[in-house]
Amino acid sequence: MSDYIIKVGKRKTAIARAIIRKGSGKFLINGYPIELYPIEILREKMLEPIRILGDRSKEIDIDVNVHGGGNTGQADATRTAMAKAIIEYFKDSDLEAEIRAYDRSMLVNDVRRKMPKKPMGYGARAKRQKSYR
């Protein structure tokens, strides 16, 4: 195991960089403890890789810097970055299989983007109504 590992996770326009190192079980998001994250459902989503890790989470510290996007995109990017960093730090194939079985999207960046608006419409697919015919 090296001193620290840096991994990146992306979702929509959000980019999260997770730094994992030996420690005492502290998990910071942009310098604040993860327990202070205001949206509970997103906080639980970000804690999933740590919950899968179990008792071994007490021997590491994870510091995540995330920017861009909105709340959900940032939460998904954070979750992906943390899961990738945990797998590389512990180098445990059983742990990777467990995370992959729980949710494959924790290890794969979601590349979907918003479809651009088209001319003569209100959005990507919606069109203005025609009053004739």
Curated annotation (Swiss-Prot):
Gene of this entry: rps9
Protein name: Small ribosomal subunit protein uS9
NCBIfam families: PRK00474.1, uS9_arch
InterPro entries for the chain: Ribosomal_Su5_D2-typ_SF, Ribosomal_uS9, Ribosomal_uS9_archaeal, Ribosomal_uS9_CS, Ribsml_uS5_D2-typ_fold_subgr
Pfam families: Ribosomal_S9
Top-rank lineage group of the source organism: Archaea
Any one GO BP annotation for this protein: translation
Gene Ontology MF annotations: RNA binding; structural constituent of ribosome
Family note: Belongs to the universal ribosomal protein uS9 family.
Gene3D superfamilies (UniProt xref): 3.30.230.10
Organism per entry: Picrophilus torridus (strain ATCC 700027 / DSM 9790 / JCM 10055 / NBRC 100828 / KAW 2/3)
A single cellular component GO annotation: cytosolic small ribosomal subunit
Keywords, in A-Z order: Ribonucleoprotein, Ribosomal protein
